[in-house]
Amino acid sequence: MPTINQLIRQPRVSARVKSKSPALENSPQKRGVCTRVYTTTPKKPNSALRKVAKVRLTNGFEVISYIGGEGHNLQEHSVVLLRGGRVKDLPGVRYHMVRGALDTQGVKDRKQARSKYGTKRAKAGKK
């Protein structure tokens, strides 16, 4: 236990909080260009083909980003918008694509949670 004089000379230093999405550099989103679009398999016990893309950001970082929703139109050289948010069963994937922004289209025929997938509201059908 330090004395009060020791604390006056050298105060306690609080631990620095480490960012979970360092490539965003404290921005809410960042723009980037897809360098590779591919599928990968999740960790045990899950099984799927998850759609991901390697993206070079405007600040020079190269990160792996998850493409949410059913179906996508992305290919190499597509310009995309990234947000933070990891995918628990994909190691190294710490970013999500923002659907419906820049070159990324929204999810087709989406009815619920549309804002998360960049889908416009459908026209009211006949009853």
UniProtKB/Swiss-Prot annotation:
Transmembrane residue ranges: none
RNA-binding keyword on record: yes
Basic residues bias spans: 113-127
HAMAP family reported for this sequence: Ribosomal_uS12_B
GO MF annotation list: rRNA binding; structural constituent of ribosome; tRNA binding
InterPro entries, per the entry: NA-bd_OB-fold, Ribosomal_uS12, Ribosomal_uS12_bac
Gene: rpsL
Organism: Herminiimonas arsenicoxydans
Superkingdom of source: Bacteria
Summary of the function given for this chain in its UniProt record: With S4 and S5 plays an important role in translational accuracy.
Record PTM 3-methylthioaspartic acid, positions in chain: D89
Residue ranges of the region described as Disordered: 104-127
NCBIfam families: rpsL_bact
SUPFAM superfamilies: Nucleic acid-binding proteins (SSF50249)
GO biological process, one term: translation
Protein name: Small ribosomal subunit protein uS12
UniProt xrefs under Pfam families: Ribosom_S12_S23 (PF00164)
Membership in a protein family: Belongs to the universal ribosomal protein uS12 family.
Cellular component terms (Gene Ontology): small ribosomal subunit
Subunit structure comment from the entry: Part of the 30S ribosomal subunit. Contacts proteins S8 and S17. May interact with IF1 in the 30S initiation complex.
Gene3D superfamilies to which the protein is assigned, alphabetical: Nucleic acid-binding proteins (2.40.50.140)
